[in-house]
């Protein structure tokens, strides 16, 4: 595991976008060789998406041969609702790049058979050859996607009933009316993300500092689902300075001392970055 500590959230967005760009360009995708990317929603990845759009507009990266799989979607929320994850992804990322809509995969929370929808999503990931790089953010309680505290660490894509804390946290997106927040969602499982060849976790803000501490300084615990990625052979966590407030001083010093190695992860012409991310 690598922990990349950067000064601000803006640097997290820029650094992570450079890393994703390098991974895709080094992969050299083409008509018979697609790069498969797992993507999150929420405020945390917005800086990543803005920078990837910028790099695309500058001609530094193409998404023509990239397939994407999103982490989650609300149940019974129309696709064109401003808080649906379909709307979020198209508004904040997909419509600004050259990705083919047929290569975009987002769970359908309005499917007539939700279980079948989840199973089909897993099948599509397998048919695509698995996910090369899965990007995620976490909540203050360490959840990833809608895998909330207590979720199985080998779970697959499924229907989840949302916890009261999640409903209360998300009410701000629905006019602070908790009755309007969807009570269920479709989500990839922890096991689904663990199957990816590489996992990148973005952590921003002091309110997520305790979750980062649980993620890297304590043991694997299903009450902190992000901790599962300690056991992934290629995990890279990228955080801002505020998110390190609960870490031990020696932990922060250790990872900051590796900053020269971390810079090589986004340098042109550097070797297979996954070898540097163990």
Swiss-Prot record:
Keyword Cytoplasm appears in the UniProt entry: yes
Record's GO cellular component terms: cytoplasm
Pathway(s) of this molecule: Nucleotide-sugar biosynthesis; UDP-N-acetyl-alpha-D-glucosamine biosynthesis; alpha-D-glucosamine 6-phosphate from D-fructose 6-phosphate: step 1/1
GO molecular function, one term: identical protein binding
Annotated S-S bridges: none
Pfam families cross-referenced by the UniProt entry: Glucosamine_iso (PF01182)
Subunit structure: Homohexamer.
Similarity field: Belongs to the glucosamine/galactosamine-6-phosphate isomerase family.
Protein name according to UniProt: Glucosamine-6-phosphate deaminase
Annotated organism of origin: Aedes aegypti
Organism phylogeny: Eukaryota, Metazoa, Ecdysozoa, Arthropoda, Hexapoda
């Amino acid at each position: 595991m690598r922990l990349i500590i950067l000064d601000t959230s803006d640097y997290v967005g820029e650094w992570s976008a450079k890393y994703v760009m390098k991974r895709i360009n080094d992969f050299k995708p083409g008509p018979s060789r697609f790069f498969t990317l797992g993507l999150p929603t929420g405020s945390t990845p917005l800086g990543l998406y803005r920078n990837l759009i910028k790099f695309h507009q500058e001609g530094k990266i193409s998404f023509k041969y990239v397939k994407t799989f999103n982490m989650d979607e609300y149940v019974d929320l129309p696709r064109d609702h401003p808080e649906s994850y379909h709307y979020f992804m198209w508004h904040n990322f997909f419509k600004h790049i050259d990705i083919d809509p047929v290569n975009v995969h987002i769970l359908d929370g309005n499917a007539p058979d939700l279980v079948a929808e989840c199973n089909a999503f897993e099948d599509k990931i397998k048919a695509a050859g698995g996910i090369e790089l899965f990007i995620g953010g976490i909540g203050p309680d360490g959840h990833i996607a809608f895998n909330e505290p207590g979720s199985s660490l080998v779970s697959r894509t499924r229907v989840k009933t949302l916890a009261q804390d999640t409903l209360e946290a998300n009410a701000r997106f629905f006019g602070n009316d908790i009755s309007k927040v969807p009570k269920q969602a479709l989500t990839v499982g922890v096991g689904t993300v663990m199957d990816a060849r590489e996992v990148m976790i973005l952590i921003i803000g002091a309110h997520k500092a305790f979750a980062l501490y649980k993620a890297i300084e304590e043991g694997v615990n299903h009450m902190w689902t992000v901790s599962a990625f300690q056991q992934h052979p290629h995990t890279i966590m990228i955080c801002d300075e505020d998110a390190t407030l609960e870490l031990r001083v020696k932990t922060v010093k250790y990872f900051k001392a590796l900053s020269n190695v971390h810079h090589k992860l986004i340098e042109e012409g550097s070797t297979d970055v996954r070898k540097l991310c163990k």
